[in-house]
Amino acid sequence: MHRTTRIKITELNPHLMCALCGGYFIDATTIVECLHSFCKTCIVRYLETNKYCPMCDVQVHKTRPLLSIRSDKTLQDIVYKLVPGLFKDEMKRRRDFYAAYPLTEVPNGSNEDRGEVLEQEKGALGDDEIVSLSIEFYEGVRDREEKKNLTENGDGDKEKTGVRFLRCPAAMTVMHLAKFLRNKMDVPSKYKVEILYEDEPLKEYYTLMDIAYIYPWRRNGPLPLKYRVQPACKRLTLPTVPTPSEGTNTSGASECESVSDKAPSPATLPATSSSLPSPATPSHGSPSSHGPPATHPTSPTPPSTAAGTTTATNGGTSNCLQTPSSTSRGRKMTVNGAPCPP
């Protein structure tokens, strides 16, 4: 799950503070030529004696610099939402000022200019504030239309919706609210509880303060939220087919075949590696042809190998089972053209 990156407000201070007074923006005003922002009172007082931007020295206007500045309502709303208690303190200072100087009039002033706008009307929230919300089951668009028709006909009073009211801190997330509903209603783990604002599902990491800022709720009533219960999505796991890797034996038969492929058959062995020498005719190229003949014990039944099996050569061993020698007793074998004794 992807979450939003949380950063400290001190990292945003260079973008929220006025370079002239060193405080947060109050009535933020932006210069059109260079888009640098300042407090309205600060920049108006500065341009009375200067015609250049205090940050980049761009000429604002040759004769009337006040024509090149604009009120930045969006930036001011961002500052009020990011800095806790700033809007409330500013409105209090304005009310105190006009209370101390009752004869002072505000030309074309609004309620906000006079400090008569409450924090609830502005929609600003703090982390420690308590938010009143209503939660009810989401019935869908079709059920809501049917319910509306019943209400218009006068039959809707018989059905009462299960609306519940809660008081929660503004910093509480949607995930915590969903867990609360799951525990309250004993929802099994195979189902998920989803929170909605009207018909739009909410992200789990949204706080109640985020919902108040994103959606058109002006604190003139409880925050209207809805919930629905849906089956949890299960991830499909595809079965993995094991693929035999090269050089690995999967059975005893394959191991036997690999050994038999490496060891040659007795019929194609050279004379030096023959395991059936003849005492009458020494093998050509063998060490016994240049020296005294070696004596070999004779056995009534010479060793033989069954078809499909291999004999140990050069000190090698075989892990295959050998058949009894009686199966190959009638087979004739020759070594270098000389018949072997039976």
UniProtKB/Swiss-Prot annotation:
BP-aspect Gene Ontology terms: anterior/posterior pattern specification; apoptotic signaling pathway; cellular response to hydrogen peroxide; chromatin organization; chromatin remodeling; embryonic skeletal system development; embryonic skeletal system morphogenesis; in utero embryonic development
One Pfam family per UniProt: zf-C3HC4_2
One GO cellular component, as annotated: nucleoplasm
Zinc finger (RING-type): 18-57
Compartment(s) of residence: Nucleus
Motif (Nuclear localization signal): 81-95
Keyword Iron-sulfur recorded: no
Per UniProt, location of the Glycyl lysine isopeptide (Lys-Gly) (interchain with G-Cter in SUMO2) cross-link in this chain: 51, 88
Polar residues: compositionally biased ranges: 243-253, 319-328
Residue ranges of coiled coil: none
SMART domains the UniProt entry points to: RING
Sites of Phosphothreonine modification: 237, 334
Region (Disordered): 237-342
Predominant subcellular localization, coarse grouping: nucleus
Keyword vocabulary terms for this entry: DNA-binding, Isopeptide bond, Metal-binding, Nucleus, Phosphoprotein, Repressor, Transcription, Transcription regulation, Ubl conjugation, Zinc, Zinc-finger
InterPro entries: RAWUL (IPR032443), Znf_RING (IPR001841), Znf_RING/FYVE/PHD (IPR013083), Znf_RING_CS (IPR017907)
Low complexity bias locations: 263-318
Superkingdom of the organism of origin: Eukaryota
Connected disease: Probably related to tumorigenesis since it is expressed strongly in most tumor cell lines.
Assembly and oligomerization: Exists as both a monomer and homodimer. Component of a PRC1-like complex. Interacts with CBX8, RING1 and RNF2. Interacts with CBX7. Interacts with PHC2.
General function of this protein: Transcriptional repressor. Binds specifically to the DNA sequence 5'-GACTNGACT-3'. Has tumor suppressor activity. May play a role in control of cell proliferation and/or neural cell development. Regulates proliferation of early T progenitor cells by maintaining expression of HES1. Also plays a role in antero-posterior specification of the axial skeleton and negative regulation of the self-renewal activity of hematopoietic stem cells.
Protein name (database record): Polycomb group RING finger protein 2
Originating organism: Mus musculus (Mouse)
